[in-house]
């Protein structure tokens, strides 16, 4: 089983065998040997050797290879979408959009590098001031399972464009997608060692994160793991650390004219990707009174009709399975804990089969829960909070250590102006789902939701560092000398 990609070749790992499973059927989706610490060391060494040549390559030449990667992704869209669906449970319709986003990321990343970094010159006395940007060197990229193609791609593409070399450690729950993606890079003509793939579980990740020869670490994943990485690298200022983590995201519902539109956007916010987007709304703030009652009744009615099915079902479902049977069980347990604390189920969650990742979309009213835990339940579990005043809704929405996304559904522009000025989040949407984001805009949040703005336009900022120079083409003695100097 040659599932590692090191120095331009597919090789076997020397660590334990592990497997990924289709969460909708429990069938094995991928199996292979993990990378040991020695394998990780070889991958980092390969990236280090390749760095000089890759970073010295003309910018346009690097971009041509990356553009070929995008073209090949488009050609292989269906095969890669199938790999994504098989390992994650994501319906094919959604997996196809993920592949399209991967390809689109290339043009955006090239534009971002040129506009946010690149090279700038300004004439000055006796010379010219030049701003250039240099790659960091070898960067480790850690990918998540929820978007196993798109999210690591959002680190890898801008890193390569800037001239870095990469060691990629994907989620152990989606290694097959990583293999398929790296095969496309190989066919695109990426030189040996520029991108290396190390498959594995926790030990592989620890070996890579602790390696003394990496110059940067780009991570998308849970806030708990990202916080540990932040602590680990707190004493290593030489490492550039880019973290994109989770959120306990609020969606505030105003008394709108079109209740069905509000319900639609709430369902998209809370349950798209089976609630496994870091920007999904976890807390739904609904006004007290008759309007709020009507909204909740309609929200519950439409939610109760959502069915989850296998990724390639015909007709396609809105939701697939969550990533694993274990993840499904944790969500049901989270609901039970909330109920024990005083929450009232509106649409109760249940796991269809203990061997599979299928749960139904659920709504629980947590208004009466004292000291509501500030936790991200990564799945289709929406928590409703009833509010008396708009200021109360904003105050409670901001009562979180996270700050990734937030949304407002309201007809009044003045209400929106107040909301956007007072809410604390990196992505703030009006009359759009909380998980609606533009790849041409910054993506990321405040607080425990991360630092930098990985995976989108601002990724160029952390993939290269600025180098300032003052230059003159000719060495000459100044016309005016400093006091005390005699020539």
Curated annotation (Swiss-Prot):
**Key word Oxidoreductase present:** yes
Gene Ontology terms: biological process: arginine catabolic process to glutamate; arginine catabolic process to succinate
Q: What sort of enzyme, by top EC class, is this?
A: oxidoreductase
Q: Which Pfam families match?
A: Aldedh
E.C. numbers: 1.2.1.71
User: What pathway does this protein act in?
Assistant: Amino-acid degradation; L-arginine degradation via AST pathway; L-glutamate and succinate from L-arginine: step 4/5
CDD domains reported for this sequence = ALDH_SGSD_AstD (cd07095)
Domain of life, per UniProt, equals Bacteria
UniProt keyword list: Arginine metabolism, NAD, Oxidoreductase
Question: Which residues does the record give as NAD(+) binding sites?
Answer: 221-226
Q: Where is the active site?
A: 244, 278
Spell out the molecular function terms from Gene Ontology.
succinylglutamate-semialdehyde dehydrogenase activity
Name under which the protein is recorded: N-succinylglutamate 5-semialdehyde dehydrogenase
């Amino acid at each position: 089983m040659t599932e590692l990609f090191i120095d331009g070749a597919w090789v076997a790992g020397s660590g334990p065998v592990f497997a990924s499973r289709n969460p909708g059927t429990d069938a094995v989706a991928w199996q292979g040997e993990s990378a040991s610490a020695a394998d990780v060391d070889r991958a980092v060494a390969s990236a280090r050797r390749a760095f000089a040549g890759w970073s010295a390559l003309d910018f346009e030449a690097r971009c041509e290879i990356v553009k070929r990667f995008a073209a090949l992704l488009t050609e292989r869209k269906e095969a890669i979408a199938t790999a994504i669906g098989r390992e994650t449970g994501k319906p094919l319709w959604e997996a196809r959009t993920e592949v399209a986003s991967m390809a689109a990321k290339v043009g955006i990343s090239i534009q971002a590098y040129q506009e946010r970094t690149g090279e700038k010159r300004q004439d000055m006395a006796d010379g010219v001031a030049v701003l250039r940007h240099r790659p960091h060197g070898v960067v480790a990229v850690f990918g998540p399972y929820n978007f196993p193609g798109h999210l690591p791609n959002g680190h890898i593409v801008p890193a390569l464009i800037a001239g870095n070399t990469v060691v990629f450690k994907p989620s152990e729950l989606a290694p097959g997608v990583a293999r398929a993606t790296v095969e496309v890079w190989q066919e695109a003509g990426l030189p040996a060692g520029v991108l290396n793939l190390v498959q594995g579980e926790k030990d592989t990740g620890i070996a890579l994160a602790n390696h003394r020869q990496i110059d940067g670490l780009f991570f998308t994943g849970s806030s708990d793991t990202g916080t540990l990485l932040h602590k680990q690298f707190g004493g290593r200022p030489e490492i550039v650390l880019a973290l994109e983590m989770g959120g306990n995201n609020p969606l505030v519902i105003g008394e709108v004219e079109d209740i069905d539109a509000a319900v639609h956007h709430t369902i998209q916010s809370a349950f798209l990707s089976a609630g496994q987007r870091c920007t999904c709304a976890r807390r739904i703030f609904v006004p007290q009174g008759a309007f709020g009652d009507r909204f909740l009744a309609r929200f519950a009615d439409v939610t109760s009709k959502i069915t989850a099915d296998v990724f390639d079902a015909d007709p396609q479902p809105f939701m697939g399975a969550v990533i694993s049977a274990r993840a499904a069980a944790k969500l049901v347990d989270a609901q039970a804990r909330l109920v024990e604390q005083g929450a009232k189920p509106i649409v109760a969650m249940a796991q269809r089969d203990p061997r599979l990742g299928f749960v139904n979309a659920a709504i629980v009213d947590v208004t009466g829960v004292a000291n509501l835990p500030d936790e991200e339940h990564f799945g289709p579990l929406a928590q409703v909070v009833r509010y008396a005043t708009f200021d109360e809704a904003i105050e409670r929405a901001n009562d979180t250590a996270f700050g990734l996304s937030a949304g407002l559904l309201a007809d009044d522009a003045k209400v929106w102006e107040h909301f956007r000025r007072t809410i604390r989040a990196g992505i703030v949407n009006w009359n759009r789902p909380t998980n609606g984001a533009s790849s041409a805009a910054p993506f990321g949040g405040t607080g425990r939701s991360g630092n930098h703005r990985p995976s989108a336009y601002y990724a160029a900022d952390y993939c290269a560092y600025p180098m300032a120079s003052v230059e003159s083409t000719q060495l000459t003695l100044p016309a005016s000398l400093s006091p005390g100097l005699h020539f």
